[in-house]
Design a protein with these regions (language model features):
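TOPRIM fold recognition
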Residues: 47, 63-143
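Phosphate-handling DNA/RNA-contact segment within nucleic-acid enzymes
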Residues: 2-88
């Protein structure tokens, strides 16, 4: 993309309605429309869907080998209602949400709608803001 004659580069992550979440070291934004992103597992239909707030957390889960089944990225906790039409068919919903008020509200909303099918997986990264921060810290320790 370009701003005032300068060229910049970013990673784009597509959503279900044709928009993109855009990230670089210097920029965080989206190309509308804003919506959730769904990544389907290869092979037969999945009974498990892992839910992430942002695509960096999804990529962190992939790096850590955590994703099993399908994955849904909210791209904003404001999209939790939009996510529900995609989550209805899953027997297990694994939530890797941020350790903040918005993440807790989102988990509460999902548990209120899906009950015992929702699992909070955030204990994995206790002491970190989110899964991406956990990956960064564990990667630094290994170096």
């Amino acid at each position: 993309y370009g701003v005032r004659g300068k060229r910049y580069f970013a990673v784009g992550f597509p959503n279900v309605t044709g928009g993109y979440e855009i990230r670089s070291r210097f920029f965080k934004g989206c190309v509308p429309p804003k919506d959730v992103s769904l990544v389907k597992a290869e092979g037969s239909p999945a009974d498990v869907c892992s839910v992430f707030e942002g695509f960096m957390d999804f990529l962190s889960a992939a790096t850590l080998g955590l994703e099993k089944g399908d994955c849904l990225v909210l791209n904003s906790v404001a999209n939790v209602e939009k996510a529900m039409r995609y989550l209805d068919g899953y027997g297990c919903i694994d939530c890797y949400l941020d350790h903040d008020a918005a993440g807790r509200r989102t988990l509460k909303t999902l548990k209120g709608h899906y009950g015992e099918r929702v699992y909070d997986r955030s204990a994995l990264y206790d002491g970190c803001k989110d899964l991406n921060e956990y990956l960064q810290l564990t990667t630094k320790k290994e170096q």
